[in-house]
Amino acid sequence: MNTYKEHYNLCKKTFQESCASGYNDVYDLRLDQEIFEKDEKYLTLVKKIAEQVHNKLNNKQDVLENQWATHLNGWRDIPELDELFSTIMPEIEKKVFKSNAQIEILHCYRNKPDVNPDSSWLWHYDDCPDQFLKLVIYLTDVTEDNGCFQYLQNSSGEFPMVPTNRTHPRHDGQPFFFKGKRIPPEETQNRINEGYSINSLVGNAGTYALMHPNIYHRATVPSTGSTPRECLFFFIRPALTKRKSYSEGISSIIPERNVKRYQLD
């Protein structure tokens, strides 16, 4: 077992809890906002998590600053996160992965207003292995003015996606389909000319999207006077065995690590 594909095939063979969902496995998903219910339990957990994250960010409590965002590194002592993981992960496993799954990385941050768009704030793809999924959960109400996530989609529900060369943990992804994993403006415009349109993920706290990391997407910059978006970003991959806790083995923003690869278990 040397490749991500071989690993995932084995993960699926050892899993007994799959359910009908419209997805055969992770390869079918592009972006979905209905994998798990936004019920009272879920929204209550999000609210409690959001309050603690907001206070920690305001108090600069174990944070990492960069040009575009304030990242909370110290989220592990928020008890409701473990309950949130236990609520949503079984649904993601049964309906999409059709295998056990591991939250490999969790980034928790607040966007900064009025910065020059760069990095993730330009149209890009993450160049992750095809077996990786990304989940964003908003902790605040998000509009098109305060840092929403955007993606391309057409009227048939199709999403343009960039292929990756990352087939095993030692592969660095080169050659990249687009230099620096940034999608040139003319390429985005070509997709728009083909009938794709820019869609904004907006909504109240608790709004989420589970997506393939290699679809065309970008973050946006909060405008002056807005309340910047605060959110959780998960990177989730298949796992051979069920963890005792979904909190087990998750990396945060520190120490820095490559979000585009994972080790085979």
What are the functions of these language-model segments?
Residues 26, 130-136, 146, 198-200, ...:
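Extracellular structured ligand-interaction cores
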Residues 146-215:
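Double-stranded beta-helix
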Residues 120-128, 215-219:
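Histidine-centered catalytic micro-motifs
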Residues 112-113, 152-159, 235-241:
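Short edge-strand/loop segments of extracellular domains
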Residues 99-103, 124-128, 139-148, 154-156:
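Active-site region of the double-stranded beta-helix
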Residues 128-144, 202-205, 210, 235-239:
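Short, conserved beta-strand element in jelly-roll/cupin
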Residues 5-8, 12-13, 45-48, 54-57, ...:
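Non-heme Fe(II)/2-oxoglutarate
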Residues 1-121:
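Non-heme Fe(II)-dependent double-stranded beta-helix
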